[in-house]
């Protein structure tokens, strides 16, 4: 079984010590795990269907690239060069020749396949322990074709969790305030992107100032401060539908919103008659 291990050095000194010993730690001792990410195989009919919908020539290879980049940026894995692979993706997914993967020093192997089923994207993937010569995990996902990048992030999460024992973080998004325009007339828009910088899109038009966006920890909702019609108010935005609404009909200015840990309530501040107050959970 593959696990990523960290070796800790414990220095034991006698109680009666008369000299000061200094230990300088100059580098870690954790080497990235060599892992082979085989391109996901795909039949010709599925390839043509996805190319027509997504304008991608080989969606299986594209998903594999997302997984490979995620693993590499984590710093814990060393994805091996695909040019060194000795086994075709469609064969490796059925039964890897572990001696071939051992030759290129791979300790873990990811294989899989992609199919176009009922207008949906179906992805199957497997994680193999090359050293032990056995399967570690096998999962399948079905979703709309446009979610192909997210499938790559989910696969990475599962692999990361299985090999490190820690929760994955790749299937996450970042909400932020984007700025553009000249220095004297900056325009601020609410924006969102994947954790790897892809799928960036604006959620507001920039007609009003937006500040302090906060993600709901349990759903696809965002709360933020907007100066719509020059009146500072806290808003709630559904990322999936684009529907937004004012949070609470309070007089005066509302600001500094934040979700409760369970995502069911919002706490914020409001100012009325020059008196600053804090709301309770609403």
Predicted features along the sequence, with ranges:
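Short beta-strand->alpha-helix linker/helix-N-cap micro-motif
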Residues: 26-97, 110
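Residue-level detector of Asp-centered blade-edge/turn motifs that repeat once per structural unit
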Residues: 168-170, 217-218, 261-262
